[in-house]
């Protein structure tokens, strides 16, 4: 079975960021409704993420993705219509999207494998803020995701349900120059295939974060968390419970009206519990230089929402719970660009190079190692272009290249692969 990378119901660019996906909407009182539907047809060179010597199976793919969001009218729109409007007592946003996937094998020998892959992925989310933009406020959120993710053996898959639910309290005295939040989040991951059911787990995360603004376009930031991860179904499957701890301190501010810098650094420790537990205990960090292409328009550091036209260059280092071994450490170097040309053509480009390090991997009973520590660089590059024929209809192209650059073999599984995807689509949105 293959250790594929995470997939989600949000492969489409317009689902990942509402700035790209939503149109004018339907206004009813203090609420906005944004329905939409997209259809795509394209090519996938290696859906099963197989190594070059394991018969990569190319295919044609079709995706149909309806979506709908409902939210209260934003503060900026309220102020634009009636001056300095009083913040609402409650604001919320709910969203639901689903993707139906169909496959056509390009090699007749792969027809049976692909006939079993048609599936539906979906995501739903809810965010609720109580007494927003006041000295004391609260937030509640929940989301549920069904991920469709193949292994390199077509008879098995990593399809799973992931849910989160959390709440927090925020204190913001003095007109919002200072704010501090404490929160709790519960997470549950459930694998549908019985071959991977033992990987199901639950997490509890207690977090806090603070911000102090000064100068007045700069802020000192702090965040910290303590987590508890448990594998309940089979403690002998080789996966270890853990209590990860993270703490970071940093700065976010404008260098000029069009250029901002985020820099955060701290320490993280994994605290895995069990025989031959492999631990991460070291630096975690993030740095990002962002260019606001349209000066002073919607810059969130100037008091508005993030605009569509931005570019960013960044680096992030963190450790993550892993289903292959105990954890992996990712050093991600990334570049992003999004720009709306003349209100008609949207271009979004994302690229990343991520050396990913794994510690020594042990077999299920944790007594014998199955592979020494190794690093497998990961490459991801996505380009999305959409021409909007009107305020509600667009034609788009999505291309994506991804690769795991390694020849490491773990338990007879070659972890190296590369994949190219290209889709032509149409989208209606309000």
Task: Please report, for each region that a protein language model flagged, where it lies by residue.
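Sec/Tat signal peptide C-region and signal peptidase I cleavage site
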Residues: 3-9
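Gram-negative and organellar
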Residues: 9-430
């Amino acid at each position: 079975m293959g250790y594929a990378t995470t997939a989600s119901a949000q492969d489409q660019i317009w689902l990942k960021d509402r700035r790209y996906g939503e149109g004018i909407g339907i206004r009813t009182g203090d609420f906005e409704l944004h329905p939409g539907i997209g259809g795509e047809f394209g090519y996938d060179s290696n859906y099963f993420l197989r190594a070059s010597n394991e018969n990569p199976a190319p295919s044609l793919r079709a995706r149909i993705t309806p979506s709908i969001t409902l939210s209260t009218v934003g503060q900026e729109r309220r102020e634009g219509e009636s001056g300095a409007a009083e913040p609402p007592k409650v604001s919320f946003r709910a969203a639901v999207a689903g993707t139906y996937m169909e496959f056509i094998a390009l090699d007749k020998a792969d027809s049976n494998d692909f006939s079993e892959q048609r599936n539906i992925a979906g995501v739903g989310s809810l965010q609720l803020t109580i007494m927003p933009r006041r000295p004391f406020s609260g937030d509640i959120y929940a989301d549920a995701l069904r991920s469709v993710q193949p292994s390199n053996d077509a008879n098995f898959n990593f399809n799973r349900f992931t849910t989160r639910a959390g709440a927090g309290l925020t204190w913001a005295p003095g007109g919002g120059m200072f704010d501090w939040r404490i929160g709790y989040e519960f997470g549950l991951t459930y694998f549908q295939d019985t071959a991977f059911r033992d990987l199901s787990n639950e997490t509890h995360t207690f977090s806090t974060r603070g911000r102090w603004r000064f100068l007045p376009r700069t802020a000192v930031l702090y965040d910290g968390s303590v987590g508890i991860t448990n594998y309940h179904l089979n403690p002998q499957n080789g996966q270890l419970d853990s209590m990860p701890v993270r703490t970071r301190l940093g700065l976010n501010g404008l260098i000029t009206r069009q250029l901002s810098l985020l820099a955060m650094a701290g320490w993280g420790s994994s605290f895995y519990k069990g025989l031959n537990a492999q631990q991460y205990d070291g630096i975690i960090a993030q740095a990002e230089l962002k260019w606001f292409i349209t000066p002073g328009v919607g810059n969130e550091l100037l008091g508005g929402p993030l605009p569509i036209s931005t570019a960013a260059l960044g680096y992030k280092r963190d450790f993550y719970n892993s289903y292959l071994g105990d954890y992996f450490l990712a050093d991600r170097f990334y570049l992003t660009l999004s720009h709306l040309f003349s209100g008609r053509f949207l271009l979004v480009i994302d690229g990343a190079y991520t050396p990913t390090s794994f510690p020594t991997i042990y077999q299920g009973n944790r007594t014998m190692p199955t592979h020494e520590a190794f690093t497998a660089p990961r490459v991801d590059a996505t380009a999305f272009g959409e021409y909007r024929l009107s305020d509600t209809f667009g034609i788009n192209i999505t291309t994506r290249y991804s690769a795991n650059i390694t020849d490491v073999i773990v338990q007879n599984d070659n972890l190296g692969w590369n994949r190219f995807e290209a889709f032509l689509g149409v989208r209606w949105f309000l």
